[in-house]
């Protein structure tokens, strides 16, 4: 995506937002909030306690402002994020050294535009002979949100819109490797929210990101929801802090892709290359291994070889690179350890690590391997894709189920056989199952909504505003039955 294309898309989205979501009369006539609209005071507080206290005060004031102000706040946050998608993308790559800024632009943009807002909080009414019961969605209060270094700005944008749309405030705990990018994203969103009428302190964090401070935030008595987007270690901390509260925890995945003989060739290979190389494969939903049926093998491999974005390694090069990038992994390994120096790096950097030079247009390294190869069983988070062959579609689906590790996170299939597609979807039971497209299309690039936090271990799936609100039931007996 060129700079001109990015500028055009951002301009079009901002115009559409202005047209579709004009300021309502109710908001326009409302007196200004007491907090100065020129600044949010900065999102960084000196300590965890100070950040939580600030968030508690802000949330109480925010809830009193009502839904119309909340809608305008979300609209303003979207516009601020959209206007800065490219700058935040470049900041993230510069700070973390991971991913491709052009791809991060797309992630930031889809999070700003496709994350559900207040419209996700749908009230319900039940009427009958005994009267009426009304169900409305109320905020929890303060949400503690842990964010990863792999998708820093996108996660801040997505989580902040979801959490604030539900009427909460949020204290973020960014990964230390992406702290600067996350704070800048928070500052932009916070200032936009305040300018739209929100109190300051609605989006905040604290100095000195550390393991101890993260634990203190998760265990803080005044946070009502713990939201964790990160690796297994921090998820374990969130689940064992000893505090009773709602916890939404994202977890690992090792998304398999099955290609059968009825797939569309070469489109299936093109989709796999796009998805597996997008942002250098650091998305937890990205294609991590391809399992192709024996009857489809030759056509799939031919399609891979004809695409200049993919560079095929030989067996010797593969083993050399595996030793370099995977410290601990393989079948049966529950806690793989990767060489962080290569996580999220360009394919050219991986190739250079083994003394190999590849063409500039190559975005993905790939290789055909046996079923038991470590690459098939390890979530590698880099543009290094294994392709393995199964006897038939049933064997391919069984292998995909095993390689995914029971995480029930993400899987995909390329097939035009409805029976095969149904069989795999039912077998995998994943939060995201994508048919005949890159897995990104299950995360907001296709139909549906966007999220950067997929709470598979806690049963939440793709999170949105309603996950951060609790239903309140109000019953009136004997009245309001009018039919």
Where are these regions (language model features)?
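Terminal low-complexity tails and localization/encapsulation signals of metabolic enzymes
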Residues: 2-40, 127, 131-139, 347, ...
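Structural signal for hydrophobic packing residues in well-ordered secondary-structure cores
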Residues: 14-21, 56-59, 63, 77-85, ...
């Amino acid at each position: 995506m060129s700079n001109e294309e990015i500028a055009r898309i951002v301009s079009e989205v901002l115009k559409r937002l202005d047209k579709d979501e004009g300021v309502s009369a109710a908001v326009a006539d409302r007196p200004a909030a007491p907090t100065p609209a020129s600044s949010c005071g900065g999102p960084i507080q000196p300590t965890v306690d100070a950040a939580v206290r600030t968030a508690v005060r802000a949330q109480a004031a925010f809830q009193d402002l009502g839904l119309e102000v909340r809608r305008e706040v979300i609209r303003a946050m979207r516009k601020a994020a959209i206007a800065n998608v490219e700058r935040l993308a470049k900041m993230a790559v510069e700070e973390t050294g991971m991913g491709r800024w052009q791809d991060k632009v797309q992630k930031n943009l889809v999070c700003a535009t496709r994350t559900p807002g207040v419209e996700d909080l749908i009230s319900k009414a039940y009427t009958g002979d005994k009267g009426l019961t009304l169900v409305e969605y109320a905020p929890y209060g303060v949400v503690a949100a842990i964010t990863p270094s792999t998708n820093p700005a996108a996660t801040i944008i997505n989580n902040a819109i979801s959490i604030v749309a539900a009427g909460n405030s949020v204290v973020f705990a960014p990964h230390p490797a992406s702290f600067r990018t996350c704070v800048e994203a928070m500052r932009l969103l916070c200032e936009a929210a305040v300018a739209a009428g929100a109190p300051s302190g609605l989006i905040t964090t604290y100095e000195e990101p550390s393991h101890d401070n993260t634990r203190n935030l998760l265990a803080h008595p005044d946070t009502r929801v713990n939201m964790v987007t990160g690796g297994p270690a921090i998820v374990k901390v969130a689940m064992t802090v000893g505090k009773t509260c709602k916890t939404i925890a994202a977890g690992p995945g090792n998304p398999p892709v099955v290609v059968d003989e009825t797939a569309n060739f070469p489109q299936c290979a093109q989709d796999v290359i796009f998805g597996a190389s997008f942002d250098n494969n650091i998305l937890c939903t990205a294609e991590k291994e391809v399992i192709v049926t024996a009857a489809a093998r030759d056509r799939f491999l031919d399609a891979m070889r004809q695409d200049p974005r993919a560079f095929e390694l030989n067996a010797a090069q593969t083993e050399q690179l595996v030793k370099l990038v995977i410290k601990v992994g393989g079948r049966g390994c529950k806690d793989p350890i990767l060489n962080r120096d290569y996580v999220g790096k360009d394919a050219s950097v991986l190739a250079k690590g083994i003394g190999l030079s590849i063409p500039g247009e190559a975005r993905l390294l790939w290789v055909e391997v046996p079923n038991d190869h470590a690459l098939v069983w390890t979530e590698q988070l880099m543009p290094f894709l294994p392709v393995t062959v199964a006897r038939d579609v049933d064997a391919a689906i069984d292998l995909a189920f095993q390689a995914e590790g029971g995480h029930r996170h993400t899987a995909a299939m390329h097939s035009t056989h409805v029976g095969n597609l149904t069989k795999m979807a039912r077998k995998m039971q994943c939060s995201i199952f994508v048919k005949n497209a890159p897995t990104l299309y299950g995360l907001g690039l296709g139909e549906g909504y966007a999220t950067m936090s997929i709470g598979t271990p806690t049963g939440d799936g793709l999170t949105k505003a309603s996950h951060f609100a609790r239903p309140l039931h109000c019953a009136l007996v004997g009245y309001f039955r009018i039919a």
